[in-house]
Amino acid sequence: MKSIELKTKEVAEAYSIISAAKYQKLSDDDKVKVWKISRKLSPIAEQYSKDVEDAKQRLLPSEDFPQKLQMALKYQSLRDSGEKDLPMTEEEFSKIAAEWNNYNAILDKALKDRAEEKISIEIEPITEEAFGKLMASNDWSFEQVNKLEFILE
């Protein structure tokens, strides 16, 4: 077993990659190891995802903000295509854009501590050879591979 320490956000990112992984080229033992790693990450990643969704809902500037945002996106699309009959003024659009920026800043502030929280996990790591086979079974970017390096022996 290997004890690792990751930030909550790193666990969530790794889980999103490993939970969708294909295992075809792995030995049976390595398939089980990767599956067990996924199960260790799952509850942490799922709770973090719930926390993010909860914050997104509870920290909305107003109940009608999602509708305002849709209207602003429609305005922007129509304006960019040269349409003359627009659903709002530039001033109204700017006000919604400012609300959006403020909302995102509040979300970032609210979730920063949660995302950076350190989590200790015990896993049974896989060999470099097995990791190579796992990569060969999946079409991962370099960034995705880096997020999974912790599963190596």
Regions found by a protein language model. Name each.
Residues 1-153:
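A composition-driven surface/loop motif
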